[in-house]
């Protein structure tokens, strides 16, 4: 059972091609419109307000408490958990601080041994978290 051949087969071939496109992951992702239902709603970064600092236990076989922050996004009010990278960087973040959040690198999936965390903190109060960590800049007084 191959594909349809012949002079009048164009419509059928076109229809089959359109139907088979939905088997392609990238096509489905770009055409279903689910990107707008996600917390970032199609953008790469988002600003949010820190609600609380939390520790999330690492998955087996690792044993650690990964430092994260519960953040409410300004654009749509959704609450997400965001990982705070580097040793001691959680000390630079206070509750009610404005933070910039980015994706965590696996296209919407959790990374490594941190369950359910798909985002990371990039900036705190408009200052890069890396600059604060390396003591190149100070957090502005509010």
From Swiss-Prot:
Gene3D superfamilies: Nucleic acid-binding proteins. Keywords: Hydroxylation, Ribonucleoprotein, Ribosomal protein. GO terms for cellular component: cytosolic ribosome; cytosolic small ribosomal subunit; plasma membrane. InterPro entries: NA-bd_OB-fold, Ribosomal_uS12, Ribosomal_uS12_euk/arc. The keyword Ribonucleoprotein applies. GO terms for molecular function: mRNA binding; structural constituent of ribosome. The keyword Ribonucleoprotein applies. Signal peptide: none annotated. Transmembrane segments: none annotated. It holds the Pfam family Ribosom_S12_S23. NCBIfam families: uS12_E_A. Belongs to the universal ribosomal protein uS12 family. This is Small ribosomal subunit protein uS12y. It comes from Arabidopsis thaliana.
């Amino acid at each position: 059972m191959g594909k349809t051949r012949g002079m009048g087969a164009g419509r059928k071939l076109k229809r089959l091609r359109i139907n088979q496109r939905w088997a392609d992951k990238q096509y489905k992702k770009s055409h279903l419109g689910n990107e707008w239902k996600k917390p970032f709603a199609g953008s790469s970064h988002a600003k949010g307000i820190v609600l609380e600092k939390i520790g999330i236990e690492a998955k087996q076989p690792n044993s650690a408490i990964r430092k994260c922050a519960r953040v409410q996004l300004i654009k749509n009010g959704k609450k997400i958990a965001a990982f705070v990278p580097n040793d001691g960087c959680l000390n630079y973040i206070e509750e009610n601080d404005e933070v910039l959040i980015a994706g965590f690198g696996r296209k919407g999936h959790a990374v490594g041994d941190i369950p359910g965390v798909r985002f990371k903190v990039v900036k705190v109060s408009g200052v890069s978290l890396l600059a604060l960590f390396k003591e190149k800049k100070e957090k502005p007084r509010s």
